[in-house]
Amino acid sequence: MGDLEGQDRPDPISTMVGPSGTGNLRLTSFQQVRRSILSQERRNPAPLATCTKKKLGRKEEPLLIPATINNYRRAIHLKNGARISLDVGLYFFRRARFGTLKQDMIYIIRHHRRLEIKVRFIALLIQACCRIVGYDYLFFYEVRNHLLLAALLIIIR
């Protein structure tokens, strides 16, 4: 039973997104984040998303990624035609900033399948991004207002 020991502990973000196993996200937290970020976007719009890559002995290089914010209020659209739910995405902007993105993804995969999150797309996107940047995980952000685009990991068709 030693291998199952970690499953008995509550998920680190369960208090933020709702009780374990409910399959429902608490939209109030999404709405609060959305209001805050949309107000920042209105004051200081930033149409292109960028990311940086860090490697030992190398200068930090900016890198454009194939994501634009067309109709910021509804969804973030990728050039391959996929789109990301804005409510889910804006929540992850904030969560990634505190270094808990990995735990969040595990929680989402376990408990929120009703959101039609395609787990295989998450895995493929992580692999592709890590190949491009050569780093464990990415911090995507809007250049001007520093919004983390961790929502790129949550693709909803």
Curated annotation (Swiss-Prot):
Residues 1-22 are annotated as: Disordered. It is found in: Mitochondrion. Residues 1-11 have a biased composition (Basic and acidic residues). Keywords: Mitochondrion. The keyword Mitochondrion applies. One of its GO terms (cellular component) is mitochondrion. This is Uncharacterized mitochondrial protein AtMg00400.
